[in-house]
UniProtKB/Swiss-Prot annotation:
It comes from Brucella anthropi (strain ATCC 49188 / DSM 6882 / CCUG 24695 / JCM 21032 / LMG 3331 / NBRC 15819 / NCTC 12168 / Alc 37) (Ochrobactrum anthropi). Residues 454-466 have a biased composition (Basic residues). This is Trigger factor. Keywords: Cell cycle, Cell division, Chaperone, Cytoplasm, Isomerase, Rotamase. One of its GO terms (cellular component) is cytoplasm. Residues 467-477 have a biased composition (Basic and acidic residues). GO terms for biological process: 'de novo' cotranslational protein folding; cell division; chaperone-mediated protein folding; protein transport; protein unfolding. One of its GO terms (molecular function) is ribosome binding.
Length: 477
């Protein structure tokens, strides 16, 4: 096998490989000899089939197998010999000349192909012990826990039909028919819909206009859908709703005791408070970690500047761009609606993709040098969590993951990254700072502008007054 480097520019490489016909012929002869010992062909005794006959019957198929084996093995072995790591699977380039291919399969021509690839850049891990980050910490008050317990427990309250006008916290049962310009719109009608006034379940302005209604009332209300509403044909539009009030019910007094907790599947009120506190701690903890992680990544971003493999950047950009366009399409919005242009958005998101790839390579190198590993137990837990996301398709998803190494690698990557972050946190300066929950949950404007140069479109919701559109999540960089 003759190997010649034909391209070496930056991270780009191309090598030309020539496998002489005599080497192919030697491999074929070995395979034919092995096959002769096992071949059962009418008219010949076992092991006595002439090589020429076997070659006539199986020569081309055997040679095709040999060629494929060379292609499969060469990428790994040749890069190992060159002490290089390819950023992606090398591209195999072969002649498209059918006559030449036939000659190779007949053993009459050298097998020539090229491998085109990008190498991973060499990264020297720098001293990161001087990195300093601030970890925002929120003290969770008993009052906050109690408020959340009350909100959760309120779902267990029974309602009792009342006479008279509806007030906030009363439940109204209504039929409604939504109209745009006097014409009913898809998804804008419902019967026996139950709505607790003041819950914020419906769009702004809807519930407020039902305060004071009585059973039997018929009323037309006018509302304006939020500009970011998920259903594009309703976003920002004024609509009317014909309302028929069928019942007004008042909530029974909320009692917080062990019986209420048991209705929620928890053994006691004290345990409910504990569970709620743990949930709040977990929510705040996730926000805190993301903010700390961003500080670490920003510090690493300043310390590591190098060329990144363009194929990795292209793949990352395509993933981001696909999601952004999906979000915009679902919301029925354009880049102009988000006060930007497609060209500007592409430029910003490509920068984000390049940063992600570069920092991913840095974290990978830091983790490798530190001996960070993902255990089989951690990986199996991730597989289990992934399978659980598809009720009714568990077997199919599990089989897909079992047969698709790349899919499992995608599950492994975030686990590895978080373990590297843990390693960094244990070796850098971390200062805790007590903040309010409002300060903790306030959006980081710098992070938001980097993650989404265009305002992130809201996901699509049902074309009805129910639920305000959720804000999209920013991209982690």
């Amino acid at each position: 096998m003759q190997v010649t480097e034909t391209l070496n520019e930056g991270l780009k490489r191309e090598i030309k490989v020539v496998v002489p016909a005599k080497d192919l012929e030697a491999k074929l002869a070995e395979r034919l000899e092995t096959a002769r010992d096992r071949a059962k062909i009418n008219g010949f005794r076992p092991g006595k089939v002439p090589a020429a006959h076997l070659r006539k019957m199986y020569g081309k198929s055997f040679m095709a197998e040999i060629v494929n084996e060379i292609l499969n093995d060469s990428s790994r072995s040749l890069l190992a010999e060159r002490n290089e790591k390819s950023a992606t699977q090398p591209e195999v380039i072969m002649s498209e000349d059918e006559k030449e291919a036939e000659q190779v399969l007949d053993g009459k021509a050298d097998f020539v192909f090229s491998l085109n690839y990008e190498v991973l850049p060499a990264i020297e891990v720098k001293d990161f012990s001087k990195i300093a980050v601030t970890r925002e910490v929120v003290d969770i008050s008993d009052e906050e826990v109690d408020d959340q317990v009350k909100r959760i427990a309120s779902s267990t309250r029974a309602f009792e039909t009342k006479k008279g006008k509806a007030e906030n916290e009363d439940r109204v049962t209504i039929d409604y028919l939504g109209k745009l310009d006097g014409e009913p719109f898809e998804g804008g009608a419902d019967n026996d819909a139950q709505l607790v006034l003041g819950s914020g379940q419906f769009i702004p302005g809807f519930e407020e206009q039902l305060v004071g209604v009585k059973a039997g009332d018929e009323k037309v209300i006018t509302v304006t859908f939020p500009a970011e509403y998920g259903a594009a044909h309703l976003a920002g539009k004024e609509a009317t709703f014909d309302i028929t009030v069928k019942e007004v019910a008042k909530p029974n007094e909320l009692v917080l005791d062990d019986e209420t907790a048991k209705k929620l599947g928890i053994e006691s009120l004290e345990r409910l408070r504990q569970v709620v506190r743990e949930q709040i701690e977990s929510q705040y903890g996730q926000i805190t970690r993301q903010k700390v992680k961003r500080q670490i990544l920003d510090a690493l971003d300043g310390d590591y500047q190098f060329a990144t493999p363009q194929k990795l950047v292209d793949a990352e950009f395509n993933n981001i761009w696909q999601q952004i366009n999906f979000d915009l399409q679902q919301a029925g919005r354009t880049f102009e609606d988000e006060e930007t242009t497609e060209e500007a958005a592409r430029e910003e998101y490509r920068k984000l993709a390049e940063r992600r790839v570069r920092l991913g390579l840095v974290l990978s190198e830091i983790g490798e040098k530190a001996g960070v590993e993902v255990s089989e137990e951690e990986l199996q837990r991730a597989v289990y969590d992934q399978v659980r996301r598809y009720p009714g398709q568990e077997k199919e998803i599990y089989e897909f993951l079992r047969k698709t190494p790349d899919a499992v690698a995608n599950l492994r990557a975030p686990i590895f990254e978080e373990k590297v972050v843990d390693h960094l946190l244990a070796n850098i300066s971390v200062t805790d700072k007590k903040v309010s929950k409002e300060e903790l949950t306030a959006e980081d404007e710098d992070a938001a502008s980097e993650a989404k140069p265009a305002k992130k479109a809201a996901p699509k919701k049902k074309a009805a007054p129910k639920k305000k559109a959720d804000e999209g999540k920013s991209e982690e960089a």
